[in-house]
Amino acid sequence: MSRPFRVLLVDDNPADLMLAQEVFAEHGERLTVSTCASGEEALGRLRRGPMPDVVILDVNMPVMSGFEVLQAIKDDPALLSIPVVMLSTSSQPGDIARAYTLHASSYMVKSNSFQKFVDQVDAFVTFWRESRTPSWPDRPGS
């Protein structure tokens, strides 16, 4: 049995954390979700391990913004390969461009409907599972 897909969810809003955890709970044992309420807490957890398969990071947080956390992740050689999805209420092109300039893997806009969020989480889980299970037979002599 393969291990569950590990998600680190970082958001300073307890209501958003709770709602997202409910969305993730629909995946049952396929996902494990850890949460952090600040960027500082998230960086500490990432450096201690275990590494998540994806970090979902709120953009607008006090003290350390999501952009600052993303920059710190990408500046750390031990963390830079972790995919980071930015989650924000802003759909401003400048915010989206900044996220991708800092090497975010994806940028999702928060909305009243979390269906798109669920769909994107499903896509990450599917990609992760398929990328770790070869779909081709081993070649003789390799």
Name the predicted role of every residue range:
Residues R3-P4, R30, P50-V54, A78-P83:
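His-Asp phosphorelay/catalytic-motif detector in bacterial-type signaling
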Residues P4-A15, A20-F24, V55:
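Conserved acidic segment of CheY-like receiver
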Residues T35-V54:
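Acidic, metal-coordinating helix/loop segments flanking the phosphotransfer/catalytic sites
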Residues L57-D58, S88:
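Active-site residues of response regulator receiver
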Residues M61:
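Receiver (REC) domain active-site loop signature in two-component systems and cognate sites
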Residues S105:
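Short, glycine/charged-rich "phosphate-handling" switch motifs in NTP-dependent
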Residues D119, T126-S142:
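CheY-like receiver
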